[in-house]
């Protein structure tokens, strides 16, 4: 994300590529969104806010803080992807499935290491707090 919002355009440019639809429980998705993306849009970073607002309004929903509307839009988006993506290129995947479905779709062996758990809410909040820090001067490095 946010590139996933442009999957039709990306797939048009790379028609042989697989489309990985990452799904999760709608309530879990909302909890993550309301703890990461929504607070970030309310931050003082105007560039971030403009990007999120434009993306949500053009590709998703304008009522970003409306839980029910956002969940409905999330679920409708997943239905739309499943209905419009070429079945031969679509991989529907949930993080708890790990490497298996992705590696199978790509005809690759499953790595001998656990599937990474990254981009958590705490990771996002740390990234966001670092973005909100003033830039370091050359003398601080």
Regions from the language model: what does each represent?
Residues 20-31, 79-138:
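The conserved 3'-phosphoadenosine-5'-phosphosulfate
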Residues 1-35, 41-92, 97:
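PAPS-dependent sulfotransferase catalytic domain
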Residues 12, 31-65, 69, 113, ...:
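Terminal low-complexity/charged segments
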């Amino acid at each position: 994300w946010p590139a996933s919002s442009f999957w039709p355009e990306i797939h048009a440019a790379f028609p042989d590529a697989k489309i990985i639809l990452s799904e999760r429980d709608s309530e879990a998705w909302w909890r993550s969104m309301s703890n990461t993306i929504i607070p970030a849009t309310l931050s003082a970073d105007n560039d971030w806010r403009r990007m999120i607002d434009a993306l949500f309004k053009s590709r998703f929903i304008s009522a970003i803080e409306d839980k029910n509307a956002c969940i409905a839009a999330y679920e409708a988006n997943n239905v739309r992807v499943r209905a419009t993506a070429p079945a031969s290129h679509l991989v529907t995947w949930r993080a708890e499935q790990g490497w298996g479905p992705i590696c199978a779709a790509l005809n690759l062996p499953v790595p001998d290491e656990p599937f990474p758990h990254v981009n958590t809410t705490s990771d996002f909040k740390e990234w966001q707090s670092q973005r909100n820090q003033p830039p370091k001067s050359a003398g601080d490095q």
